[in-house]
């Protein structure tokens, strides 16, 4: 009989952490984090990383596994999941994937494009061009070479602009076409995925604001100050571009006021939640949607997982 893998997705501040731990207890599971920010050590408050007390007796994976200066790709995530699932099953446990990084879920569901690896020389060339002419110029160049990719990539998204241009320069082909035609990896097993969705978006927005202010009370700015002591980290580092951290960095640089920092941090988190919900809505035919406000949501999820 083919093994099943269970999943719980949802936007930030939707209550995934406490719900997932309760569910993991019920189905005898270990949790694999599906969150691109939780992999980093020393980034605890701003990522709402579950504490050891919150984790309780449930073993969690892919939390605190790399330094903020290191990178962790979708391919790295898939490789880790495929290794961890076997270890978890060998212990007689179920696998429960929990998080809000939808690109990770997408990689598991659809597989990953087998595109060429990054080349340092090309990256350095692109970085020199960015410094000389600006990121908007590079986005315009991408638009000339691959309009479809340029339309999908935000003009301020340096990481994705660089990657698209890099692949075009290496292969001589359009990035958008290669992404569609070269898929590898993904899960062999069936993924039974539930996603939390708010019936009332204003409640989620209020929760986001409340949690952001709680993070400040818990010492979020002290956490960022500690990260700033590492000379290898800047506000352009992938880890520091996580929601909240970049805005805190700008405030501590003196670029914005404290009030602007708080406002921008909350707005950025709400925008993240909106993007997460867009992913979920696009997948609603393949996953089970569960309203955040539903008082019986845990039971609904357990029934979908065939645990009564």
From Swiss-Prot:
Q: Which residues bind ATP?
A: 10-17
GO process terms (BP): tRNA modification
Q: Gene3D superfamilies, alphabetically?
A: 1.10.20.140, P-loop containing nucleotide triphosphate hydrolases (3.40.50.300)
On whether Transferase is a keyword of this UniProt record, the answer is yes
Q: What EC number(s) does its UniProt record assign?
A: 2.5.1.75
Q: Which reaction does it catalyse?
A: adenosine(37) in tRNA + dimethylallyl diphosphate = N(6)-dimethylallyladenosine(37) in tRNA + diphosphate
Binding of substrate: at which residues? 12-17
Q: Which SUPFAM superfamilies match?
A: P-loop containing nucleoside triphosphate hydrolases
Q: InterPro entries in the record, alphabetically?
A: Dimethylallyltransferase, IPT, P-loop_NTPase
User: Region (Interaction with substrate tRNA) spans which residues?
Assistant: 35-38, 159-163
Subunit structure of this entry? Monomer.
NCBIfam families according to UniProt: miaA
Q: What is this protein called?
A: tRNA dimethylallyltransferase
Q: Which gene encodes it?
A: miaA
